[in-house]
């Protein structure tokens, strides 16, 4: 055929598909639910044309297949007809994290959804060694039943018998749309212990005191509260490492977040095991359970990283804006190690070299040219007092070369 995939509008119409062959072949329709596609021909010999008619689609996007089979030559080919719909599938959790009382009971998670819950594949992962399987098959799991009613996912949970330990579970919701594209939402549940306690809140300084250069593993149920000050979508979080002369690990930035204390005094670098575990949204106020993580001290300058933070360890997350963050303005000379990984406005700064972009590099050596020889670029910045520092910009950064002229004059950074 002269095309393998055809994308059709939601309106009814017809389509002529050229087929090139030197064989006799049969034509059959598959996955034609509702018989919305009709093909005039059932068999052809040699080059020919398929005359296809399709109906108006007042529902969700759908797909049918035209299968061509030349039995004598043991050859086959498939043509995909993807039709848009008047309706667009909606499938989005309002919040990815929820806490559960130690005594169990009902949990209600807001879910914006216009598809039938029967079309979802629902499974639950537990943090223990138990294998994940569907809710209906998992009779010994503490997540008992999941239904959907009036815009809410309703989850029934058992009490937690352990008087000390909290426990976590991940509810996986998977919807396969009419074009066979997988859409996945995950709800991370954290259940308090039998005393209905989620652990003890500790300060950032308490956690800093735990850290050492080899990494200290946290064994107690403790948690911190802070503001997320990094933007996971910017591509400019974390230091992507050049692993070889021609390769860079770009996932480091995707697995890194920065969080500061509520007063803005201290900050941590958060490292997640996978990209999917980095669910942190900029300016949101979060609570993170630290049990099972490592607190790592890095020296010269002194800074702290919390590694091994999974999405299920986020106890709560409340969306915010930049105005929610504590105001902290300084000159470069006033910066200390405590300011690392916090949100600071640097006063009266300028870029002494204003030509080009934030990354005035030969793109043939960077990711844009597929060469992966340059991970970042350092732009010089100075302030009114004569102090200077470099701004590091990763090559995957979305705004590093967007056509915007570098700012003239001086101002806040």
Give residue ranges: language-model regions:
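C-terminal edge beta-strand
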Residues: 73-87, 179-196
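Predominantly extracytoplasmic/ectodomain segments of secreted and cell-surface proteins
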Residues: 1-20, 77, 88-114
